[in-house]
């Protein structure tokens, strides 16, 4: 019998004055062990026994090893103590004006920071948790309380969990406020330190559970679900089984919130609830299959929200955010396969990226289109039923879908997940036919190899046709290749082919039109299309008023402006297009479509970045942030440029609503260099919370006037990020974004600095940033 853990019984006794805890842990072993090596970080182990007998143990830097031979049913008892962490990982302290809470973030390897354990997703066990706290506090864990005893202190003993991985355990302590709802016999509980204004998040949760139970054919497994608002939280949200944690902003959405906040909240809640089946009920064996958890939850969250909010057109956002972001990232040479070999725990956080989430989700969308909607759904249901309460691999899922659909899903998926990158399909008209060939697409313009089995779709005059393109293909009729941008590849048309597509423009969906524009921008960056040709072609889309098309064009033109602000033709093209959109959208109207409100906010903030005169006029409306939350970021950026950081800091202290407050904080990155030095003071003071630093530091290098300051203070910024966001990968992503901007003016200095600060935990971000710098330098010289 292989060694394993049957059950953990852990009692946490918290001292809420100095935020320490003492703990007694009982581990029920399964199978035979020779020395028990437990993961343990920053824990002080006092005593270890086996079946009541004292045992010798050795403490390493991040382990405690109990020496000896052990057998099935043996019981290990460990006494230990520790401090509650001040980072945003492990068992940590989260402070806000409304109070203090103890919370946990254990994914991917944070459980070892709270208690000795085998911190490995395949070592599933039952958890029996007891928490001892001051009697005026409450405690939350994955299961409902079994017993609560109150005398001098409060003892909360929770029901046993199902078998689950260590990273899904949750412990929360605080003076909480609650709102409740019910779905069937499942208690839905919204938790916050702040007053709760709306049950909107519970409504989303109820609809999501209902959708998933119907889609998977499997009931939700636990008797309750907490949605927990955490004031200081490094991740966006976390799928702890039955006790899901979120940043405050995700759970503060109400029926009257801005469209951006409502939609983001719905997608986030639906994503985490999808994990209750895909990740919690069935878990990957090791982190190389992390993508399976995250990509599936990403794809399903959009399907879920689309099922009850058609008016949002959420798959337009999916295609731009998830597919578009992944296509950009995966065209670098410093990409990685969807299924990546993970050995070092420091590597895990860096694969929580566009590939694990966006590419994986986009591949699932492509396979659903290839296998068929119902066949895909039945395959998913079979996979979950076959592996419930256990662990599985990606191949198990492909086999299930293949068994149902009868198509070679496993062969197709194995190639797509084990190989980095993706193809560009070239379409060349030859006589009365169209010749299709493929090669790997690289953003640096080099020509790649690779022969993907592409589930190709073609819109023809007679309808949609599908085929599996292995190397090349020839077709007689073509309106457009890659129908609804369902495939994860780009399409390059020769002149005649492109004319054919544009003649049929009115027949194309907005997802199809987005594909044309997205590919055009990628071909500009890679040098396949000249700047003149790009500008000529993109102007052909300027009359398209669809929200997805406007957002994509606005993003492209603003991105080019930020790359080279002193390029007159880019600045004039961007300002002209954005101004026309702002005028066309006009002021907010009562009862208007949420998509209109959302795109108004986006083009207005982009214009505030591009046009200082517009920003100066818009800044006068800074006092009206609450009137239209979708315009809050635009007005805040304008105020940052016109008034400075003191005005923004005062407003941030005034607004307790995170929907507005976070946008004010983000806009601080757009202040002048003389103001930016105050950012560190505001972090120390708490005006900028630890979790919100990343918004400021991601905007600062995008701001042409903020780049010198960022570079001069990069060591301090990295140190702050690493301390606050240990194990999350955020530092890596900030550096990936910043390095290309910083290097345009100081190429050699930035390359040298990148090597000086390089560490394993953000090595990937530095490599991607340096590669992107080389690419944008070439484009910069052409603009």
Curated annotation (Swiss-Prot):
GO terms for molecular function: metalloaminopeptidase activity; peptide binding; zinc ion binding. Binds 1 zinc ion per subunit. The active site is at 272 (proton acceptor). One of its GO terms (biological process) is peptide catabolic process. It is found in: Cytoplasm. Substrate binds at residues 107, 236-240. Its EC number is 3.4.11.-. InterPro entries: Aminopeptidase_N-like_N (IPR045357), Aminopeptidase_N-like_N_sf (IPR042097), ERAP1-like_C_dom (IPR024571), M1_APN-typ (IPR034016), Peptidase_M1 (IPR001930), Peptidase_M1_aminopeptidases (IPR050344), Peptidase_M1_dom (IPR014782), Peptidase_M4/M1_CTD_sf (IPR027268). Its cofactor is Zn(2+). Keywords: Aminopeptidase, Cytoplasm, Hydrolase, Metal-binding, Metalloprotease, Protease, Zinc. PROSITE patterns: ZINC_PROTEASE. The record marks 357 as: Transition state stabilizer. It is an enzyme of class 3 (hydrolase). Zn(2+) binds at residues 271, 275, 294. Pfam families: ERAP1_C, Peptidase_M1, Peptidase_M1_N. Its main location: cytoplasm. GO terms for cellular component: cytoplasm; extracellular space; membrane. Belongs to the peptidase M1 family. Monomer. Part of the Tricorn proteolytic complex. PANTHER family: PROTEASE M1 ZINC METALLOPROTEASE, PUROMYCIN-SENSITIVE AMINOPEPTIDASE-RELATED. Proteases F1, F2 and F3 degrade oligopeptides produced by Tricorn (themselves probably produced by the proteasome), yielding free amino acids. This is Tricorn protease-interacting factor F2.
């Amino acid at each position: 019998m292989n060694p394993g853990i049957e059950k953990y019984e852990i009692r946490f006794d918290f001292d809420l004055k100095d935020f320490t805890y003492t703990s007694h842990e009982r581990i029920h072993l399964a199978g035979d062990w020779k020395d028990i090596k437990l993961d343990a970080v920053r824990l002080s182990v006092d005593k270890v026994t086996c079946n009541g007998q004292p045992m010798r143990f050795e403490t390493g830097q991040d382990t405690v090893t109990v020496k000896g031979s052990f057998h099935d049913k043996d019981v290990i008892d460990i006494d230990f103590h520790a401090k509650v962490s001040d980072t945003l990982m492990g068992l940590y302290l989260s402070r806000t004006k409304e109070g203090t809470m103890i919370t946990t973030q254990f994914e991917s390897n944070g459980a070892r920071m709270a208690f000795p354990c085998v911190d490995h997703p395949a070592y599933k066990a039952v958890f029996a948790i007891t928490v001892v706290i001051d009697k005026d506090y409450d405690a939350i864990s994955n299961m409902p309380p079994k017993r609560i005893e109150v005398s001098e202190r409060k003892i909360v003993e929770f029901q046993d969990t199902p078998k689950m991985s260590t990273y899904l355990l949750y412990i929360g302590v605080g003076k909480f406020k609650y709102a409740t709802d019910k779905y069937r016999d499942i208690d839905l509980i919204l938790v916050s330190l702040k007053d709760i204004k709306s049950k909107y998040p519970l409504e989303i949760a109820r609809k999501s559970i209902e959708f998933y139970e119907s889609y998977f054919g499997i009931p939700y497994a636990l008797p309750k679900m907490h949605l927990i608002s955490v004031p200081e939280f490094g991740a966006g949200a976390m799928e702890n089984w039955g006790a899901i944690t979120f940043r405050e902003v995700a759970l503060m959405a109400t029926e009257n919130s801005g469209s951006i906040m409502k939609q983001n909240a719905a997608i986030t809640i639906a994503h985490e609830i999808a994990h209750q089946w895909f990740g919690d009920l069935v878990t990957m064996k090791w982190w190389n299959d992390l993508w399976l958890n995250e990509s599936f939850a990403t794809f399903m969250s959009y399907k879920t929200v689309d099922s009850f909010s058609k008016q949002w057109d959420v798959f337009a956002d999916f295609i731009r955010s998830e597919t578009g972001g992944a296509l950009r990232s995966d065209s670098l040479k410093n990409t990685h396969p969807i299924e990546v070999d993970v050995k070092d725990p420091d590597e895990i956080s860096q694969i929580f990226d566009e590939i694990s989430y966006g590419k994986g989700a986009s591949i699932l969308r492509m396979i659903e289109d290839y296998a068929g909607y119902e066949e895909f759904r039945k395959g998913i249901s079979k996979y979950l039923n076959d592996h419930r309460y256990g662990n599985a691999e990606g191949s198990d899922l492909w086999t299930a879908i293949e068994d149902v659909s009868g198509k070679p899903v496993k062969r197709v998926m194995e190639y797509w997940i084990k190989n980095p990158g993706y193809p560009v399909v070239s379409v060349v008209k030859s006589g009365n036919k169209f010749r299709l060939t493929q090669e790997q697409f690289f953003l640096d313009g080099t020509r790649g190899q690779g022969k993907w089995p592409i589930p190709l779709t073609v819109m023809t005059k007679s309808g949609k046709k599908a085929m599996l393109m292995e190397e090349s293909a020839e077709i007689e009729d073509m309106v457009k290749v890659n129908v609804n941008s369902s495939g994860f590849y780009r399409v390059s048309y020769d002149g005649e082919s492109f004319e054919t597509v544009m003649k049929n423009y009115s027949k194309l969906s907005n997802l199809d039109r987005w594909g044309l524009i997205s590919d055009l921008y990628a071909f500009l960056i890679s040098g396949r299309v000249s700047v003149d040709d790009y500008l000529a072609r993109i102007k052909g889309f300027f009359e398209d008023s669809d929200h997805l098309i406007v957002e994509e064009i606005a993003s492209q033109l603003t991105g080019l402006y930020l790359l080279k602000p002193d390029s007159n033709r880019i600045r004039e093209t961007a300002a002209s297009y954005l101004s026309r959109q702002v005028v066309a959208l006009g002021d907010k109207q009562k009862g208007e479509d949420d998509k209109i409100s959302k795109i108004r906010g986006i083009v207005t903030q982009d214009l505030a970045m591009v046009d200082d005169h517009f920003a100066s006029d818009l800044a006068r409306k800074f006092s009206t942030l609450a009137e239209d939350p979708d315009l809050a970021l635009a007005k805040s950026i304008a105020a940052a440029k016109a008034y400075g950081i003191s005005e923004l800091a005062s407003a941030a202290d005034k607004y307790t609503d995170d929907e507005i407050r976070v946008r004010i904080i983000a806009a601080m990155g757009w202040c002048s260099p003389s103001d930016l030095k105050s950012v560190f003071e505001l972090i120390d003071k708490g005006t900028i919370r630890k979790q919100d630093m990343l918004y400021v530091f991601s905007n600062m290098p995008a701001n042409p006037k903020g780049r010198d300051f960022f570079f001069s203070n990069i060591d301090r910024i990295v140190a702050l990020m690493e301390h606050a966001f240990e194990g999350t990968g955020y530092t890596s992503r900030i550096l990936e974004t910043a390095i290309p901007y910083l290097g345009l003016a100081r190429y050699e200095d930035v390359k040298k600095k990148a090597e000086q600060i390089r560490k394993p935990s953000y090595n990937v971000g530095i490599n991607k940033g340096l590669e992107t710098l080389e690419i944008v330098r070439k484009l910069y010289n052409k603009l």
